[in-house]
Curated annotation (Swiss-Prot):
Protein name as annotated: Profilin
TM ranges: none
Record's subcellular location: Cytoplasm, Cytoskeleton
InterPro entries linked: PFN, PFN_euk, PFN_sf, Profilin_CS
Function: Binds to actin and affects the structure of the cytoskeleton. At high concentrations, profilin prevents the polymerization of actin, whereas it enhances it at low concentrations. By binding to PIP2, it inhibits the formation of IP3 and DG.
Species in which this protein is naturally found: Prunus dulcis
Alphabetical UniProt keywords: Actin-binding, Allergen, Cytoplasm, Cytoskeleton
Residue ranges the record marks as coiled coil: none
One Gene Ontology MF term: actin monomer binding
Organismal lineage: Eukaryota, Viridiplantae, Streptophyta, Embryophyta, Tracheophyta
Amino acid sequence: MSWQQYVDDHLMCDIDGNRLTAAAILGQDGSVWSQSATFPAFKPEEIAAILKDFDQPGTLAPTGLFLGGTKYMVIQGEAGAVIRGKKGSGGITVKKTNQALIIGIYDEPLTPGQCNMIVERLGDYLIEQGL
């Protein structure tokens, strides 16, 4: 299965008639493995800040998580494994695997829990595969 199929079939999937706004799988060096057409253009320093928070949990909380110039307020996650952010009626979930970052961006009517489930389910699968 190609990385694009993972994005199309597993991240941009239909959940009760709703889907993520955007999704991507990035290498931990910030390279794009695959992304939805709607995924925002991001800066390398935004990915570097996300990776730093995985290594040193709590570093994003004071400043917020930025992706594509959009600021998300960092909310509870799982230290070293998952970062979650909120902005208005939407938000972001970032799951770290051994080699990649799985990113899902959502807005209503999709719920934070649905976004978490979509992103973390694929992330857990890739971890099981050694990726």
